[in-house]
Curated annotation (Swiss-Prot):
The protein's name: F-box only protein 13
Domain F-box, residue spans: 64-110
Disulfide bridges in this chain: none
Pfam families noted in UniProt: Beta-prop_KIB1-4, F-box
Domain of life where this protein originates: Eukaryota
Classification via InterPro entries: F-box-like_dom_sf, F-box_dom, Gal_Oxase/kelch_b-propeller, KIB1-4_b-propeller, SCF_F-box_component
GN (gene name): FBX13
Length: 457
């Protein structure tokens, strides 16, 4: 077995040893896995420990605990802890491992893994042709390149949401939805919603459960403020709920939208070129983020957040059936790009702005006092490189408190950068360029999913 594959196998044995009652597995933790953890703060340099040291440790361990000695039950539990990419590589050369892909007990073991490092499904300008993902475990690009990834008659389907191990697509013509596991290729059409009185769709959100059997929920927000409503699709019932109205709740620090509904609400400001400009309330969204939203689920409430057409953050409480607009972070006369993400049940705002001849990219969250608190900032040396590019940011939150920021500037100068921020380690990483047939591939946005073989539609 290659040393790198064996090393990953050892890590999966470590995970099993932490939960198993087998004396053989329990002793693994004590004998081989007391390693100090190092944390790099700031911008990651990606340093690794000595290859010789790792290979010596792996060779010794493999001779002590050969895999052939593991029974099927223990083997499947070990395999379930493997990173998904490693499992696919290793199962391709071992019939015994390959057969586990269809095993119900193996899928059950996989479903009991609390979380997996996220994969980022990248979306280019031609949203329905995307097939590249970034594997955050191995820090590498992968081309799913499945001939059946989306059938030719489904080229009008655009990725709009994700949760767990599933991606959600929406047909730009009919409005129908399609759920898909990008790893296995399994898919399912979602029945059409009943007539929604031609209300414009504002947002699509999705949640999943990893328990067996797995289930998922789709939420759609429709209408125009202040007349919003929502519908919920439950996979267990295979049906949509009735259209439910959302009541508007006003706050003293609520959005500036009301001020701009009056004739006297127009704001003028002086641009850098010395021209008088009218502040616009019209938010320009990337087509790939047209229905983008995030959903947070707690014991008290389910809340869907999305950006309104005039740039405010709308919070829709599905439990109380009401919505409110959150206070803006910046006044309308400042040019900026904004997006929302969710990590571990918390909504974050990513904001790119230019001020005093420099660019600033910051991450914010709303505290209990409804005040914005900064939780992260791209190092100034990097953010300054984005200055003057007139670019847009599209972001997504992933499992493990990771946030991907896609920066892209439109022609005449195409300029794309991709940054990942770890909220826990407070560490930024820039993703390498992605290449196909020797040419760089550019992306405008992404969706985050966990690579779960067991996720069913």
């Amino acid at each position: 077995m290659p040393s790198s594959a064996t090393s990953t196998y050892l890590l999966s044995l470590k995970q099993v040893s932490l939960t198993a009652s087998s004396p053989l597995l329990l002793q693994l933790k004590d004998r081989f896995f007391h390693q100090p953890k190092l944390l790099n703060m700031g911008f990651s340099t990606g340093k690794r420990k000595s290859r010789d040291e790792e290979e010596d440790r792996v060779s010794f361990f493999a001779s002590e605990f050969p895999m052939d000695d593991l029974n099927d039950d223990v083997l499947e539990r070990v395999l379930s802890w493997l990173p998904t990419s490693c499992f696919f590589r290793m199962s391709s050369v071992c019939k015994r491992w390959k057969s586990s892909q269809t095993s119900k007990s193996f899928k059950l073991a996989c479903s009991q893994i609390p979380t997996r490092d996220p994969w980022f499904f990248m979306i280019d300008n031609d949203s329905n042709s995307s097939s590249f993902v970034f594997d955050s475990t191995e820090n590498s690009w992968k081309n799913l390149n499945r001939r059946d990834f989306l059938h030719h008659h489904r080229q009008d389907f655009i990725p709009v949401a994700s949760s767990g191990g599933l991606l959600c697509y929406r047909c730009s013509i009919s409005g129908d939805f399609l759920l898909r596991n990008p790893l296995t290729g399994s898919s399912r059409d979602i029945p059409s919603q009943d007539n929604n009185n031609n209300k414009p769709l504002q947002a699509v959100a999705m949640t999943t459960t990893t328990v067996t059997p797995s289930s998922y929920t789709l939420v759609t927000i429709s209408g125009e403020i202040p007349n919003l409503s929502f519908k919920i699709y439950e996979s267990n019932a295979d049906s949509w709920s009735k259209d439910q109205e959302l009541e508007s709740v006003k706050n003293n620090d609520s959005s500036l939208h009301d001020d701009y509904d009056t004739d006297s609400g127009t704001v003028y400001f002086l641009s850098k070129q010395g021209n008088v400009v009218v502040a616009s309330n019209n938010l320009q969204r990337s087509p790939s983020k047209q229905y983008s939203s995030v959903i947070t689920v707690t014991d008290e409430a389910e809340i869907v957040y999305f950006l309104s057409s005039y740039g405010t953050i709308v919070a829709c409480d599905l439990t109380k059936r009401c919505f409110t607009e959150l206070p803006k972070l910046l006044p309308p006369f400042l040019e900026y790009s904004i997006d929302l993400v969710e990590c571990e049940g918390t909504m974050y705002v990513i904001l790119l702005s230019e001020f005093f001849e420099s660019a600033s990219l910051r991450i914010w969250r709303l505290d209990n006092n409804r005040e914005w608190v900064q939780v992260g900032m791209l190092p100034p040396a990097l953010s300054h490189e984005l200055y003057g590019k007139k670019g847009d940011i599209n972001c997504v939150g992933g499992a493990g408190n990771k946030i991907l920021v896609c920066f892209n500037a439109s022609p005449p100068e195409v300029y794309c950068r991709y940054f990942v921020y770890d909220l826990v380690a407070e560490e930024w990483n820039e993703l390498p360029k992605c290449f196909k047939d020797g040419e760089a591939v550019d992306f405008v946005s992404a969706l985050s999913f966990q690579p779960r073989i067991e996720a069913t539609v």
